[in-house]
Amino acid sequence: MRKSTKQFTFGAVLLCLLAGGGYFGYQQVFTKGLDRLSKKVCDDAVARETVIRALPDSRSAEQAAKQNGSGTSYTFSCRIATSGDSILSGEAKIQDTSERTWVDFYGSHAGTALLRSSADGVEALAQLDNHHGTASVYVPCIPRGVQASAASESYALVTEARAIGDTRSTGTPLRQVVTDFAYQIAKHAYTSGECRTPRSFPKELPRYKAH
Protein backbone atom coordinates (compact mmCIF):
# COMPACT_ATOMS: atom_id res chain seq x y z
CA MET A 1 0.00 0.00 0.00
CA ARG A 2 2.88 2.33 0.90
CA LYS A 3 4.56 1.65 -2.46
CA SER A 4 1.34 2.43 -4.28
CA THR A 5 1.03 5.75 -2.43
CA LYS A 6 4.61 6.71 -3.34
CA GLN A 7 3.99 5.84 -6.96
CA PHE A 8 0.82 7.94 -6.97
CA THR A 9 2.64 10.90 -5.40
CA PHE A 10 5.51 10.66 -7.86
CA GLY A 11 3.06 10.44 -10.75
CA ALA A 12 1.14 13.48 -9.51
CA VAL A 13 4.33 15.52 -9.16
CA LEU A 14 5.49 14.46 -12.60
CA LEU A 15 2.13 15.39 -14.10
CA CYS A 16 2.30 18.83 -12.48
CA LEU A 17 5.81 19.38 -13.81
CA LEU A 18 4.79 18.35 -17.30
CA ALA A 19 1.71 20.56 -17.15
CA GLY A 20 3.78 23.49 -15.90
CA GLY A 21 6.38 22.92 -18.58
CA GLY A 22 3.70 22.68 -21.21
CA TYR A 23 2.12 25.95 -20.05
CA PHE A 24 5.51 27.68 -20.05
CA GLY A 25 6.21 26.33 -23.52
CA TYR A 26 2.79 27.50 -24.71
CA GLN A 27 3.49 30.99 -23.38
CA GLN A 28 6.88 31.17 -25.05
CA VAL A 29 5.61 29.98 -28.42
CA PHE A 30 2.13 31.49 -28.64
CA THR A 31 2.10 34.64 -26.47
CA LYS A 32 5.58 36.22 -26.54
CA GLY A 33 5.67 37.59 -30.08
CA LEU A 34 5.75 41.21 -28.94
CA ASP A 35 8.40 40.50 -26.31
CA ARG A 36 10.70 39.24 -29.05
CA LEU A 37 10.67 42.60 -30.83
CA SER A 38 13.71 44.86 -30.43
CA LYS A 39 13.74 47.04 -27.32
CA LYS A 40 13.05 49.95 -29.66
CA VAL A 41 11.25 49.49 -32.97
CA CYS A 42 10.87 51.48 -36.18
CA ASP A 43 14.43 52.82 -36.47
CA ASP A 44 14.60 53.24 -32.67
CA ALA A 45 11.63 55.62 -32.72
CA VAL A 46 9.23 53.70 -30.46
CA ALA A 47 9.73 51.77 -27.23
CA ARG A 48 8.69 48.11 -27.36
CA GLU A 49 6.87 48.57 -24.03
CA THR A 50 4.55 51.10 -25.67
CA VAL A 51 3.60 48.52 -28.30
CA ILE A 52 3.02 45.88 -25.61
CA ARG A 53 0.69 48.30 -23.78
CA ALA A 54 -1.39 48.66 -26.94
CA LEU A 55 -1.57 45.20 -28.52
CA PRO A 56 -2.59 41.82 -27.04
CA ASP A 57 -0.34 38.76 -26.72
CA SER A 58 0.45 37.01 -29.99
CA ARG A 59 2.54 34.19 -31.43
CA SER A 60 4.60 36.56 -33.57
CA ALA A 61 4.90 40.23 -34.48
CA GLU A 62 6.63 42.21 -37.20
CA GLN A 63 7.63 45.86 -37.36
CA ALA A 64 8.48 48.11 -40.28
CA ALA A 65 9.52 51.74 -40.68
CA LYS A 66 9.77 53.88 -43.79
CA GLN A 67 11.10 57.39 -44.40
CA ASN A 68 10.59 59.34 -47.61
CA GLY A 69 11.26 62.80 -48.98
CA SER A 70 12.53 65.97 -47.36
CA GLY A 71 11.30 69.47 -46.67
CA THR A 72 7.55 69.75 -47.15
CA SER A 73 7.51 66.27 -48.73
CA TYR A 74 8.96 64.52 -45.67
CA THR A 75 7.11 61.48 -44.26
CA PHE A 76 7.97 58.81 -41.69
CA SER A 77 5.82 55.78 -40.90
CA CYS A 78 5.90 53.00 -38.33
CA ARG A 79 3.80 49.81 -38.35
CA ILE A 80 3.65 46.84 -35.99
CA ALA A 81 1.45 43.87 -36.95
CA THR A 82 0.82 40.67 -34.99
CA SER A 83 -0.10 37.16 -36.09
CA GLY A 84 -3.50 37.83 -34.51
CA ASP A 85 -4.19 40.62 -37.03
CA SER A 86 -3.78 43.42 -34.49
CA ILE A 87 -2.02 46.49 -35.89
CA LEU A 88 -0.51 49.63 -34.39
CA SER A 89 0.52 52.14 -37.04
CA GLY A 90 1.34 55.80 -37.41
CA GLU A 91 2.65 58.35 -39.90
CA ALA A 92 4.34 61.73 -39.46
CA LYS A 93 4.10 64.33 -42.24
CA ILE A 94 5.02 67.96 -42.76
CA GLN A 95 1.75 69.81 -43.36
CA ASP A 96 0.69 73.38 -44.00
CA THR A 97 -1.92 73.69 -41.26
CA SER A 98 -2.54 75.80 -38.20
CA GLU A 99 -3.27 74.29 -34.81
CA ARG A 100 -6.88 75.49 -35.05
CA THR A 101 -7.40 73.86 -38.46
CA TRP A 102 -5.83 70.64 -37.14
CA VAL A 103 -8.18 70.52 -34.14
CA ASP A 104 -11.22 71.34 -36.26
CA PHE A 105 -10.38 68.54 -38.71
CA TYR A 106 -10.36 65.85 -36.03
CA GLY A 107 -13.29 67.34 -34.15
CA SER A 108 -15.48 67.27 -37.24
CA HIS A 109 -14.69 63.60 -37.88
CA ALA A 110 -14.90 62.30 -34.31
CA GLY A 111 -18.64 62.59 -33.87
CA THR A 112 -18.09 63.15 -30.15
CA ALA A 113 -15.68 65.03 -27.90
CA LEU A 114 -11.91 65.03 -28.21
CA LEU A 115 -9.39 64.25 -25.51
CA ARG A 116 -6.71 66.98 -25.42
CA SER A 117 -3.24 67.28 -23.94
CA SER A 118 -0.33 69.68 -24.40
CA ALA A 119 3.13 70.52 -23.09
CA ASP A 120 5.88 72.91 -24.22
CA GLY A 121 4.14 73.79 -27.48
CA VAL A 122 3.34 70.18 -28.41
CA GLU A 123 -0.36 69.43 -28.83
CA ALA A 124 -2.06 66.04 -28.77
CA LEU A 125 -5.61 64.82 -29.18
CA ALA A 126 -7.55 61.59 -29.46
CA GLN A 127 -11.00 60.87 -30.78
CA LEU A 128 -13.61 59.52 -28.37
CA ASP A 129 -15.61 57.29 -30.68
CA ASN A 130 -16.73 53.67 -30.46
CA HIS A 131 -14.17 52.32 -32.91
CA HIS A 132 -10.40 51.85 -32.81
CA GLY A 133 -8.42 54.57 -31.06
CA THR A 134 -7.14 57.34 -33.32
CA ALA A 135 -4.74 59.97 -32.00
CA SER A 136 -2.75 62.85 -33.45
CA VAL A 137 0.18 65.00 -32.33
CA TYR A 138 0.90 68.52 -33.64
CA VAL A 139 4.36 70.09 -33.44
CA PRO A 140 5.22 73.40 -35.16
CA CYS A 141 8.04 72.68 -37.62
CA ILE A 142 9.70 74.65 -40.40
CA PRO A 143 11.81 72.13 -42.34
CA ARG A 144 15.37 72.98 -43.29
CA GLY A 145 15.50 74.77 -46.64
CA VAL A 146 11.85 75.91 -46.44
CA GLN A 147 10.72 79.52 -45.89
CA ALA A 148 8.06 79.99 -43.23
CA SER A 149 6.42 82.67 -45.40
CA ALA A 150 5.68 80.04 -48.06
CA ALA A 151 2.96 78.51 -45.88
CA SER A 152 -0.65 79.61 -46.36
CA GLU A 153 -1.24 78.90 -42.65
CA SER A 154 1.84 77.50 -40.85
CA TYR A 155 4.12 74.50 -41.22
CA ALA A 156 3.83 71.71 -38.68
CA LEU A 157 4.80 68.11 -38.18
CA VAL A 158 1.51 66.23 -37.82
CA THR A 159 1.53 62.63 -36.66
CA GLU A 160 -1.52 60.38 -36.80
CA ALA A 161 -1.71 56.92 -35.23
CA ARG A 162 -4.33 54.26 -34.67
CA ALA A 163 -4.87 50.73 -33.34
CA ILE A 164 -6.71 48.22 -35.54
CA GLY A 165 -8.14 44.87 -34.51
CA ASP A 166 -8.00 43.51 -30.97
CA THR A 167 -6.26 45.73 -28.42
CA ARG A 168 -5.01 45.27 -24.87
CA SER A 169 -7.18 48.10 -23.55
CA THR A 170 -10.19 50.20 -24.55
CA GLY A 171 -11.59 53.67 -23.93
CA THR A 172 -9.33 56.36 -22.53
CA PRO A 173 -6.42 53.97 -21.72
CA LEU A 174 -6.34 52.89 -25.37
CA ARG A 175 -6.37 56.51 -26.56
CA GLN A 176 -3.55 57.26 -24.15
CA VAL A 177 -1.23 54.54 -25.39
CA VAL A 178 -1.96 55.34 -29.05
CA THR A 179 -1.15 58.99 -28.28
CA ASP A 180 2.09 57.94 -26.58
CA PHE A 181 2.94 55.93 -29.70
CA ALA A 182 2.23 58.95 -31.93
CA TYR A 183 4.27 61.20 -29.66
CA GLN A 184 7.32 58.95 -29.86
CA ILE A 185 7.04 58.92 -33.66
CA ALA A 186 6.76 62.73 -33.62
CA LYS A 187 9.93 63.12 -31.53
CA HIS A 188 11.87 60.90 -33.93
CA ALA A 189 10.44 62.62 -37.01
CA TYR A 190 11.21 66.11 -35.69
CA THR A 191 14.90 65.25 -35.90
CA SER A 192 14.92 63.07 -39.00
CA GLY A 193 12.66 65.55 -40.82
CA GLU A 194 15.17 68.32 -40.02
CA CYS A 195 12.85 70.77 -38.33
CA ARG A 196 14.90 73.97 -37.98
CA THR A 197 14.01 75.18 -34.49
CA PRO A 198 15.81 73.28 -31.68
CA ARG A 199 13.28 71.77 -29.29
CA SER A 200 13.42 69.88 -26.00
CA PHE A 201 10.61 67.36 -25.81
CA PRO A 202 9.23 66.32 -22.41
CA LYS A 203 9.57 62.62 -21.66
CA GLU A 204 5.81 62.22 -22.04
CA LEU A 205 2.74 64.39 -22.46
CA PRO A 206 0.29 64.99 -19.58
CA ARG A 207 -2.10 62.07 -19.12
CA TYR A 208 -5.67 62.23 -20.39
CA LYS A 209 -8.41 62.36 -17.78
CA ALA A 210 -10.58 59.25 -17.71
CA HIS A 211 -13.96 59.42 -19.47
Can you name each region flagged by the protein language model?
Residues 2-27:
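Hydrophobic membrane-insertion alpha-helices, especially the h-region
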Residues 30-181, 186-187, 191, 198-210:
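A small/polar (G/S/T-enriched), proline-flanked helix-loop surface module common
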